[in-house]
């Protein structure tokens, strides 16, 4: 190996991010950037890291997929009994990060978390392929299992159980919405002097924008 990890670096030169050019509303600004990520045909532009923690501050993070967003917040779906589901039930605060390397951009979001409505969870669940719906029954997410064969056996059992009938949504599976209090837009710049614009929600539900030092 000719290069060490310390040698790995890239100079960011594609774009700039100006207070004059961004939307005053962070959701509209996110929509603008997300549409540009789609237009650039990035692989899974809706992939995001979500960080949660226990009440005593033990953190954990993983990748999930954004499935909806509007001015109410950012929605993903999961097993409520999973580690993240349990942590969010006990400590309903989370942080999200989108990283769009090809555009030299990231978006950081933090805020409180709440479950979406039953109808929203149903709507998305029934839009999924049948095997994905079965997977919500098969996997006791985050629990230790003896082998891969355990999952495959359970899949066969549920395929037989729901053969030729509608697969219902498990009560332990559904959507969660991150309701942001802060959203930061980061644009890579040359010499590591990146552009960082932070939107913070005020008491009157308006947003103020500040530039952060990189």
From Swiss-Prot:
Keywords: Flavoprotein, FMN, Oxidoreductase, Pyridoxine biosynthesis. Its EC number is 1.4.3.5. Binds 1 FMN per subunit. It comes from the Bacteria. InterPro entries: Pyridox_Oxase, Pyridox_Oxase_CS, Pyridox_Oxase_N, Pyridoxamine_oxidase_dimer_C, Split_barrel_FMN-bd. It catalyses: pyridoxamine 5'-phosphate + O2 + H2O = pyridoxal 5'-phosphate + H2O2 + NH4(+); pyridoxine 5'-phosphate + O2 = pyridoxal 5'-phosphate + H2O2. Gene3D superfamilies: Electron Transport, Fmn-binding Protein, Chain A (2.30.110.10). FMN binds at residues 62-67, 77-78, 83-84, 106, 141-142, 186, 196. The keyword Chloroplast does not apply. Pfam families: PNP_phzG_C, PNPOx_N. Pathway: Cofactor metabolism; pyridoxal 5'-phosphate salvage; pyridoxal 5'-phosphate from pyridoxamine 5'-phosphate: step 1/1; Cofactor metabolism; pyridoxal 5'-phosphate salvage; pyridoxal 5'-phosphate from pyridoxine 5'-phosphate: step 1/1. The keyword Lipid biosynthesis does not apply. Substrate binds at residues 9-12, 67, 124, 128, 132, 192-194. Homodimer. Catalyzes the oxidation of either pyridoxine 5'-phosphate (PNP) or pyridoxamine 5'-phosphate (PMP) into pyridoxal 5'-phosphate (PLP). This is Pyridoxine/pyridoxamine 5'-phosphate oxidase. The lineage of its organism: Bacteria, Bacillati, Cyanobacteriota, Cyanophyceae, Nostocales.
